Each structure stands twice: as C-alpha cells, then as structure tokens.
Amino acid sequence: MDRLGIAFQDITGAYVACAIHKMRPALNMTLLFDPKGSVEDFLEKTENRMGHMKIKHYLTVHPTKTEGRRDYFRVVNGEGYEGLMLDTGAQGMDTSLLNFAISDGLFQRSFVLDILDNYMERVSEHTEKVVLALPGYSYRADDFRRAFGEKHITVVDPLSLWVERNIKDEGDGDLRFYWTDRDFEFERRVEEIFQEPVRFRTYYNHPWLRGEVKKKERYLRRR
C-alpha cells in the first residue's frame, strides 16, 4: 500500500487516522476534512478526490454507518466480532459519554480515564469480551485494556485487527492534511490529538495546486 486515505466530516476521522498512525508510524497517509454538505455529497466527492490523488486505498469515517463502499463500519467492522459491543446502546452497551468526548475533540483528555473506569464497573463480571465498535475508540485502546483488564475482560479492537490484516507495506511516515474549508480551531484540535505539528492545506484537484509536485518535477515534465 503506497498511501492510505482517510476522509471525514468531523473530528472522529482524526482519531481514527491517529490510531492507525500509532500502529504503523511509517505508513504514508492523506487526511481529507470535508465538513459541509450531505453525507451523499461527501461520499461522492471523496471518491472523486481520492481518484485525483491516485489513492486506491481509503476509508470514509462518519460517526454513524453510511452507504459508502469504503465506509469504516463496512470495511473495518464488517467481519463482525463476538463480545459486548461498546457503542450507542443499539447493539450493546451505551457508551454515549465517550461519543460526546470524541465529537467535542476531547477524547485525549485525562477525564476520559474516569469514564472508562465507570463503564468498566457497570459491565457484568461474566462478560469475557468487549468490542470497540465505534470509530475513534481505538485511539485509546490501551486505556480500554487497562480499565477492563481489572475484570480480566478481553478488549477486541476491530481497527487494530484490520490494520494487521491489510496494511503491510510501509513508507516514510509522510502525513498530508487537506481541508475543503478552513477551520483553524479544528486544526488546533487535530494537532492536540496527534501531539505533533499539523498544518492543513486547501484541497485542489490538481497536484500542483495541492503542493504535491516539486519545482524540479514540474521542469522535467515540461521538457
């Protein structure tokens, strides 16, 4: 895999991308933030933009399941996993406080540890496995394991398993951040999530306008 693309409409995608980055630090990744428009428009434009960037492998990340063929829920969670689902309560345990922390861009804060401990205490001692069923949870998979490990409960992380199965090739850890609308507060939050400098650039279909073609390469192409 030359490069993995992550397209998203809210900050949930940043947590997913960062989780993958921590699992595969050398993997080249492109993040595309497109906050406006309907989900249908987002999916259609994402496929077009990934084509322009020649990115074959990508995920679309949305807090809820979409009809996208590269939707996180379909691609990552598609296999189905046994265990108590940590989600909205629709299929398992309602962990809405964590969902709010993610949507507010606060999932990296220390108070989340207290929330995890609280959820752990509410889980039956007869539970053998819990599944991190929503996008973003993998960002703190180690903290889930610490909390639920007190009851000897196994934590299943679908994203980690998907990465292990599908992402073998590595690059030099090049991260590219694009947005369709400027939002510097959002950029600051993403920087806090990655804990390293982050600079978004405006997305354009042409690679020159995206800054992906160096001057020397432009000269050679003209000759």
Q: Where do the model's predicted regions map?
A:
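Non-catalytic structural scaffold of enzyme domains
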Residues: 1-223
